C-alpha cells in the first residue's frame, strides 16, 4: 500500500535557473564576482570566450557511473543576451573629393551625424548653397611675409585682405580687435598651407646647413627632448641615438662635403623632428608655467622650422625609401607620425584618416625587419638570432631586442588608439597574453592590456552593423580600472594615461549615442530613457575633464600639453557633433526650459573650445564655421522646439530635390509618404511623433535644473571682452535661417541680434565672383559633410559673411 501511494506522487521538478557563478569559476571552485558578460577571473585568466552562466537541462539527472566532467561536456550553456546596435544604419559612408576618397569610419563624429536621423536632417538644413565660380589668379608673391602667407590661402580667402587694407583706421574697439584677430588667424593658417606646399629640393641639397647647429642642438634641444618628451614616444635608446646623431654631425662639418646615405637622411630627419617637437612643447607650455621664458627657450623658439616637415618628407623618400628600411629610418617614420598627431596644422584630418597610409608603411617596415610579437615573447632567443644575422659578435651589435620591443609597443599604441577612436580595423590583427611580471617598464606598460584592447576593437570593426553595446561598455570599464591603477602607480606615463582615459570616455559616448538612436528605431522606451540620461551624464563628465584641463594650473606636466591637446580637441569635436541630438529632442522633455539650458551649455562648450584650441589648431578653427551655423539654427526661435521648425521647413521645401539624401533613410522616406497624404505643414511635428518616437512614450527628464549649477564652463567670464566664437560668421544665412521667421511655429518672430551683427563688412559687397560658400568650403572641406552635393536650379543669393 505504501509503495502504491509513493508511486502516485509525481517526481519533484528540478529547479531551472541560471547558475549564480559562471561555469568556469564553478569548475575551478574559485570565488566569482558574478559580473556579466565576463567575470573578473575569466577576464584575468584569458577565458573570456568560455565564461557563461548556464542552465542545467530539466529532468536530465546524471546517471550513476557517468562522471561530472563527461556530463558537463554536453550541458547547454546559454550566455546573457547581447544588446546589438547598428553603427552604420545607412550603410558604409564614403566621401569623395578631388584630393582623396575617405571612408567615414563608424566611430567618427561624421558617422554620428549620419547615424542619427535628427542630426542628419540638421546637417542638411545647415548647408550653404554651393555655386561654381572661376578661380582668380593668385597674387604676386611680393611684399611682406604676412601678405605672402595670406596669399597662400584659397582664392575666396584673399578678399579678407581687402578688408584689412581698405578699412579706415579705427580706435581700439571691439571692431578693430576683431579685425586684428582676422589678420592674425588667417595669416597663421595661410602660413601652414604655404609651408606644406613649399619646394624643398634646394634645402635637401644643403641639408647639413639647414639643421640646427650641433652646439645649439645638443646644448638646448636634446636635453629638453630627453627629459620631457621621450617618454611620450619611447622608441629610442638615449646613448645609441646620441652617438648616431653626433657621428652624422661630425661627418658633415662645414669643412667636409660628404655624400649623404640612407642613415644620414634618417638622422637629419630625426634632428629636424626633435627640434619641431621641442619648439611645440615650449610654445604650449608657456601659459602653464610660472617661470619666465629663459634664454635657452628663446634660442629654441627663434629657430625657423617652417620648412622642416617638408624637408623630413623629402628625406624619407630618398634612397629607395619605399623599398628598404633601417632601424633609424623606421624611428624617423614613427617620430613623424607622432608629430602629425601633435601639430597644430592639418594633422590627421577631419576623420583621423590622413596618417593611415603612413601607419601602413610603418607596420610593413616592422614586419620586414622582424619587429613583431616574437621580440616580446622570446626576447633572449631573438637577441641571439639578431646578432648572428648581422654577422657581428654580441658585444659589437649596436642594437638589441629591447629597441625592437619599445618600437613594437609604440606601434601597437597608435594602432589600437586610432581603432578605438574611429572604429577602423586594426592594422595588427593579432595579440598575445603576457604575464604581468617583466612587462612593467613605462615604455612597455601597455603591452599587458593589448589583448583586451584588441578584443574591444574587433567587437566594433568586425561587423559595425551588429555591435554588442553591453559587452563593449563592460570591457571598457575593465580597461579603465586597470589603466587607472597603473597610472596612479606611475607605471604608465601620466600623459598617456590621461589620453587613454579620454579615448575610453569618447568611445562610451559614441556607443551610448548609437544605443539611444537604436532604442528609438526598435521601439524600446525604457532603453531610450536610460540611454539619453547616460548620454547627458557622459557629456558632463567629458566636459568637466576638459574644463579642468584648460583652466587648471595643476595636473599634467605643462611640457606634455602639446601632445594631450589633440585628444581634448577630439573630445570637443565629438561633443559638438553629438550634443545637438539632445537639443533636438528637448521638445519631449517633461521639464520646462530644458532646451534653453542645453542650448546655453552648448554655446559655452563651443566658446571654450574655439577660444582656446581653435585659435591655435587649424582643424579646430575650421570647425567653428559649421558649428556656428548649427548653433544659430538651434537658437533661431528662442524657446520654441527646434525640431518642429526643422520639420516644417523640410516639408515646405521641395524635399524630393533639396533633401534627396533623406530619401535614402527608410524613416524619412515613410514620413514623407505619410505627409503627402495630409499636406498640412503645421501637422509635420505631430506626424513625426506619431510615426517615429511618440512623445508620451519617449518623454524624458534630464533634471537639468539641478545639473545647471554643475555644468562645466557655465560660470566662466573669460571671454566677455572678446569671444572668437561669437565674433565670427554671424551674417551668413542658410535657406533655413532666411525662411525661419515665416514658419508656422514662429508667427513672424525675428532673429536675435548680437554685438557682431553690426560689424562693417560692406567692403565685400560688389566684388565680382565672390561667393560665401567657398569661404565655408575652405574650413570644412566638402561642405557640411558633403556625402552628396545638393543640386539647385535657383540663382545663388547674396550672403553677408565674416
UniProtKB/Swiss-Prot annotation:
Task: Enumerate the InterPro entries for this protein.
Answer: OAF3 (IPR050675), Transcription_factor_dom_fun (IPR007219), Zn2-C6_fun-type_DNA-bd_sf (IPR036864), Zn2Cys6_DnaBD (IPR001138)
Q: Which domain of life is it from?
A: Eukaryota
Give the GO cellular component terms, alphabetically.
mitochondrion; nucleus
Q: GO: which molecular function terms?
A: DNA-binding transcription factor activity, RNA polymerase II-specific; RNA polymerase II cis-regulatory region sequence-specific DNA binding; zinc ion binding
Instruction: Report whether Flavoprotein shows up as a keyword of the record.
Output: no
Where does it mainly reside?
Answer: cytoplasm
Which Gene Ontology terms describe the biological processes this protein takes part in? Answer: DNA-templated transcription; positive regulation of transcription by RNA polymerase II
Q: Where in the cell is it found?
A: Cytoplasm; Nucleus; Mitochondrion
Q: Which keywords does UniProt give here?
A: Cytoplasm, DNA-binding, Metal-binding, Mitochondrion, Nucleus, Repressor, Transcription, Transcription regulation, Zinc
List, alphabetically, the SMART domains matched: GAL4
Binding region for DNA: 22-51
**PANTHER family from the UniProt entry:** OLEATE ACTIVATED TRANSCRIPTION FACTOR 3, OLEATE-ACTIVATED TRANSCRIPTION FACTOR 1-RELATED
> According to its UniProt entry, what is the function of this protein?
Transcriptional inhibitor with a significantly increased number of target genes in response to oleate.
Q: Which family does it belong to?
A: Belongs to the OAF3 family.
What is the name listed in the Swiss-Prot or TrEMBL entry for this protein?
Oleate activated transcription factor 3
